[in-house]
Amino acid sequence: LGAIAAGNCAIIKPSEITPNTSKVLADLIAQTFDPNYITVVEGDKTVSEELLQQKFDHIFYTGGSAVGKIVMKAAAEHLTPVTLELGGKSPCIVEPDIHVEHSAKRIIWGKFINAGQTCIAPDYLLVHREIKEELVSAMQACLQEFYGENPQESSDYSRIVSEKHFNRLRQFLDQGKVIAGGETDAETRYIAPTLLDRVSWEDPVMEEEIFGPILPIIEYDDLDRAIAQINAYPKPLALYLFSKDKNKQQKVLQETSAGGVTLNDTIIHIASTELPFG
């Protein structure tokens, strides 16, 4: 949008796994702009590969790190500058000095929007041992409040975008201990909003961005150790901290690095028109 608003010519290549959305975008662009200046190109990865052979003035890519590396490598052949908006494992840290019910609602809301398929969803929960049991209980209550006894029947709960993505996510449910949700339906690509306890840093669910309705929970005793674990991972797109303590807030802000940080809430930093994103 920034490139178009600035008056540039642009080729837009939406994802092939969301064809209905891609068609709406293609129709909207075609109705609004001269195709000689701005157009939408649809197709699978072979189309993307062909586009990457062209000499663009700039490439902007949103997606995962693996494909981001492919885009950067192809752009380097022509010395084309790139902007990569990549995902990652966005942590959510919860200290004991919180309002439990408010925090639980904001975490559940941020995690399970679009069944967890947003790039800045909290990827995993780092919760202090002192508050863990109370917070988990509050989050379980929130899930029922938001989506009812059976989330599969809720009009507010989404499905997984593709069969490939569904199968990848379902494998994560075999790790740790499911303490909420866990139900699946392959035919409709439904995965219940799930809380996953007793997860270790070595589990596969902690090795890649989840991008789905599964929230691993890891407890900690010392904030310094929690920060060290976060910093051992690649830089996250988002980071969330729930704490009323100003000193702890400053500590996390100064000792971590992320695309964006929100204190005592989730997701909402993306809505600020005064801040850059990523």
Regions found by a protein language model. Give the residues of each.
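Short internal beta-strands
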Residues: 11-16, 126, 264-265
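ALDH superfamily catalytic-core signature
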Residues: 33, 66-201, 223-224, 263
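Conserved residues at the C-terminal ends of beta-strands
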Residues: 44, 62, 110, 242-243, ...
